[in-house]
Amino acid sequence: MSDIWKEFSWLTISEAAAYLGVEAKAIRSWLKDVSLLALPSPEDGKLRIPQVFLVAAESEGDYRGPLEVLRGTLILLRDGGFSDAEAMNWMLSEDDSLGDTPLNALRAGRKKAVRRVAGALAL
């Protein structure tokens, strides 16, 4: 398993809000409805979100927020008994059956393949 804390850029709730140009309450709402996932940092215990989970608007009016296909996958993993840490590690670590990280596969439009693997793991 990779060391996700070293391989990715992590943002606090306020940093994620600033990155997206939204209020911190929007980030907390996305965390509550499982559109986003955060883990306590091993360094300071503050909740942190991987920046790669976020979509920043490139121009006025563009979508900004969590990667839209993330929510269904996170719910599937939670329903299957994955802890938040296990779900985060799986999303950010290479999966042999996908040939990539599940997150990269989702970003590439391979939602069905990712959810099929997640469903099999959650059994």
What function would you assign to each model-found segment?
Residues M1-L123:
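Non-transmembrane "mature" sequence context
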